[in-house]
Amino acid sequence: MSRFVNLEFGGESEDQSWNQKGRLKDEAFYFAEARAAFENGSFESGLRLYSKVLEFNPQNAAAWTGQVRMLIELGEFREARLWADKALERFPHEPELLAAKAVALGRHGDLQGALAFSDASIEERGDTPYVWLARADVLLAREEPRADYCFEKALLLAPGDWFIIWLGARVRHYYEQFVLALKLLQRAVELNAGHFRLWLELGQCQQALGLVGPARNSFTQARQLNPRCQEAATALGHLSGTGLWRRVRGSWLRLFGQ
């Protein structure tokens, strides 16, 4: 429960200040920073930044929803459910908040509750890409084949949007549908080849499928785009170790004929 400490307002309220570039650090500033953190896969930072948004405007429903989504991405499904309940006390008809709670419930094992909240999100005129991605998430948790339609619906609502495609890939990856996740990530890379996170997760899918060479290339691209990406460095180290072991094992088999 440690992430609940100061989660809503991030600590004491502070006066508006200015960043080094002279931009006012207000609600809009922190919301943009939170979105950037989300896009970079920095979910802990995103969680804190959405809290900063609420310091300036506790009625920002998107920031509340953002907090729930960050908790989901961090694998904190129970906390996400509890925080969604708190947010829904303020915004009981917010479609994306209902959808986020549905995902938290589904991943936490409450499949019936997940479907009910997903239904509610759609009934609240929630015709947004995230509502449909959340629906797909719930249906995959329930092992229902209709999930494919929901993915297609989400992508149709945001044509050419790499971010939505990436989110879809993350859902596929969570449910170990690595081939389908790979296809989505390839589309996302075509749209935004300069984003390190896409290359990193592309490499993770390739690695899961045993595609060592392509995975190494993807991790290398991620590292070049973001030299501070420790996940890419660790993955490359792991692949190098795997390659060395294969060479040693091959030599051993050739020497001893086993």
Where are these regions (language model features)?
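Structural signature of tandem alpha-helical TPR/SEL1-like repeats
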Residues: 8-11, 40-48, 74-86, 108-120, ...
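TPR/TPR-like alpha-solenoid helical repeat scaffolds
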Residues: 137-141, 204-207, 230-246
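TPR-adjacent "capping" and linker segments in tetratricopeptide-repeat scaffold/adaptor proteins
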Residues: 8-29
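Helix-start (N-cap) detector for alpha-helical repeat units in TPR-like alpha-solenoids
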Residues: 27, 61-62, 95-96, 127-130, ...
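Alpha-helical adaptor scaffolds
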Residues: 103, 130-141, 152-190
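Alpha-helical segment of the N-proximal tetratricopeptide repeat
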Residues: 23-56, 62, 66-73, 103, ...
